Design a protein with these regions (language model features):
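Extracellular/surface-exposed low-complexity repeats and stalk/linker segments enriched in Gly/Pro
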Residues: 1-27
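Right-handed parallel beta-helix/beta-solenoid
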Residues: 13, 40-68, 85, 103-104
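Short, surface-exposed terminal/edge motifs of secreted or surface/virion proteins that either
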Residues: 27-42
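Beta-strand repeat architectures
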Residues: 70-77, 126
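Extracellular beta-strand repeat scaffolds in secreted/surface proteins
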Residues: 77-81, 102
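Right-handed parallel beta-helix/beta-spiral solenoid domain characteristic of secreted/periplasmic
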Residues: 89, 98-142
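Right-handed parallel beta-helix
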Residues: 101-106, 124-135, 149-167, 179-181
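Extracellular beta-strand/beta-solenoid scaffold signature
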Residues: 111-120, 136-152, 167-181
Length: 181
């Protein structure tokens, strides 16, 4: 017979376990708020009031930029971007299998700082979702492009879902470094 699952519980309104109270994958339940909490070790946070010197591992210790979170990300990480406008030093080269997920399409705006460069260099298995892109780029620059300095033999495409591109002169997605869609 399988071992029963044990869940830490609290009936105190608003009480959540501290990071030190849970192990990775362990669950806690606040029965008053009907909120289930788990600790994941593969999530990085970005907020408008964050600091790129922070760890990014907790919402209260978030990075200030998407590029700051990407710089410490590894395969399988999810970067959660809180509502706000983020001017990013591009291009930002994403490691394989890294996801960037905004709070909401209408609340997360990303502005490329370097008009002559692509915004994101995507890799196999990347996932971009719930962001809007604004600003101006040089004609031929893209929001998403494969890194022209790397060769990918991909069995897994990058995915872009529920994003809006309002960047003047830009291309949404560049394939093989030069072809656009």
């Amino acid at each position: 017979m399988a071992t029963p699952i044990r869940i830490k519980r609290s009936a105190v309104p608003g009480k959540k376990p501290q990071v030190t109270d849970l192990q990775v994958g362990e669950l806690a339940l606040n029965t008053y708020d009907a909120e289930l909490v788990t600790l994941r070790d593969n999530v990085l946070y970005v907020t408008g009031d964050g600091d790129d010197n922070n760890t990014g591992k907790k919402l209260g210790d978030a990075k200030a930029s998407i590029a700051g979170a990407v710089a410490i990300s590894t395969t399988g990480d999810v970067i959660r971007v809180s509502a706000g406008t983020y001017t990013e030093n591009n291009p930002i080269a994403l490691p394989k299998q890294v996801s960037i997920v905004g709070d909401s399409l209408r609340e997360v705006t990303v502005v490329p700082q370097n008009a002559g460069s692509d915004l994101f260099y995507v890799a196999p298995g990347n996932y971009l979702s719930e962001m809007s892109f604004t600003g101006t780029m040089t004609a031929g620059s893209a929001i998403c492009a494969f890194n022209p300095n790397k060769i990918y033999y991909s069995t897994q495409s990058p995915y872009v879902s529920n994003c809006t591109n309002f960047v003047t002169n830009s291309i949404g997605l560049k394939i093989d470094g030069s072809k656009s869609i």
